[in-house]
Structures are given as structure tokens and as C-alpha cells.
Swiss-Prot record:
Pfam families: PSII_Ycf12. It is found in: Plastid, Chloroplast thylakoid membrane. The keyword Endoplasmic reticulum does not apply. GO terms for cellular component: chloroplast thylakoid membrane; photosystem II. It comes from Oedogonium cardiacum. PSII is composed of 1 copy each of membrane proteins PsbA, PsbB, PsbC, PsbD, PsbE, PsbF, PsbH, PsbI, PsbJ, PsbK, PsbL, PsbM, PsbT, PsbX, PsbY, PsbZ, Psb30/Ycf12, peripheral proteins of the oxygen-evolving complex and a large number of cofactors. It forms dimeric complexes. The chain crosses the membrane at residues 5-25. This is Photosystem II reaction center protein Psb30.
Amino acid sequence: MNIDILSQLIAIAVTLFLGPVVVILIASRNGNL
């Protein structure tokens, strides 16, 4: 398996997972949740 493709997929997965989490954390901190 190509390491470059694997690392790119992992980076995309991490971004897609952390994106909503950060938004939820910011919203809950601001009391908008």
C-alpha cells in the first residue's frame, strides 16, 4: 500500500472528524448549543 495515499486518507479522516468536534466545542463554550 502506498504510504502517501494512506497518510493523505488519514489526514482527511482526522480533518473530517475534528472539524465538527471543534465547532461543537466552540458553540458549547459560547452557550449557543
